UniProtKB/Swiss-Prot annotation:
Coiled coil: none annotated. Belongs to the UPF0386 family. This is UPF0386 protein RHE_CH01859. Pfam families: YjhX_toxin.
């Protein structure tokens, strides 16, 4: 399955240890989505639509109220890239 360039970029960031945190409103609806790198920096490329696409692909998952992390399926979807570090 092909994924878009932005999805690829976010999954690669999450495969390196990044996470997606969500903020809910009073009605328990998702209000804001933030992506953090493994170093704790805020990554600006994630919006609610991209978050929903990744969740629909089952590439990310949250367990026990923790931030969203990449799944095994997400690791298979992401193509390997050089680390650039």
């Amino acid at each position: 399955m092909d994924i878009s360039r932005t999805e690829q970029r976010i999954l690669h960031l999450m495969a390196q240890g990044g996470r997606i945190e969500i903020i809910r409103d009073d009605n328990r609806k998702i209000e804001n989505v933030s992506c953090f790198t493994r170093d704790g920096w805020l990554y600006p490329g994630v919006d609610l639509d991209l978050f929903r696409r990744l969740k629909r692909l089952k590439a990310i998952k949250s367990s026990g109220g923790q931030p969203y992390r990449i799944t095994e399926r997400g690791l298979r979807l992401v193509r390997s890239q050089l680390d650039n570090r």
